[in-house]
Amino acid sequence: KVFEKCELSQMLKANGLDGFQGITLEEWICIAFHESGFDSRALNYYNGSSSHGLFQINRQYWCDGQDAKSTEPSVNACQISCDKLRDDDIEDDIKCVKKILKESQGITAWEAWQPFCIADLDQWKC
């Protein structure tokens, strides 16, 4: 599903992501746009691993699934199938995002954040 900006904003807010670990809703909307174009089914390959869903969560560390381009086992820290990160239900994606924020390198885990989502966030407001 490709979400509309404000539809996604409402869902992220309803699931407690606004202000979580100090990250604003506008930053999350910006990240989702630059990572996946708001597409919950996005699948990309980079550096021999796959990234999944709205937030492009990486298989190597966070989810479990077969990856044709990598034989390395997944850590599966979010205890979720990568396929579940590419469906229309993003509540489980948000739980994984929160885990990444708390247990990993925080918001810098998302490469889109620093170059695109620190300043001038007005376009991401609803």
Curated annotation (Swiss-Prot):
GO CC terms for this protein?
Answer: extracellular region
- According to the entry, every stretch annotated as the C-type lysozyme domain falls at 1-126
Q: Which residues form a coiled coil?
A: none
Give the UniProt tissue specificity note.
Mammary gland specific. Secreted in milk.
Q: Name one GO biological process term.
A: lactose biosynthetic process
Keywords from UniProt, A to Z, are: Calcium, Disulfide bond, Glycoprotein, Lactose biosynthesis, Metal-binding, Milk protein, Secreted
PROSITE patterns xrefs: GLYCOSYL_HYDROL_F22_1, GLYCOSYL_HYDROL_F22_2
Q: Name one GO molecular function term.
A: lysozyme activity
Instruction: Indicate which residues are glycosylated according to the record.
Output: 47
Q: Report residues binding Ca(2+).
A: 84, 87, 89, 92-93
Q: List the disulfide bonds.
A: 6-126, 30-117, 63-82, 78-96
Primary location recorded for the protein, binned into one broad class: secreted
Its biological purpose is as follows: Regulatory subunit of lactose synthase, changes the substrate specificity of galactosyltransferase in the mammary gland making glucose a good acceptor substrate for this enzyme. This enables LS to synthesize lactose, the major carbohydrate component of milk. In other tissues, galactosyltransferase transfers galactose onto the N-acetylglucosamine of the oligosaccharide chains in glycoproteins.
State the name under which the record lists this protein.
Answer: Alpha-lactalbumin
Q: Which organism is it from?
A: Tachyglossus aculeatus aculeatus
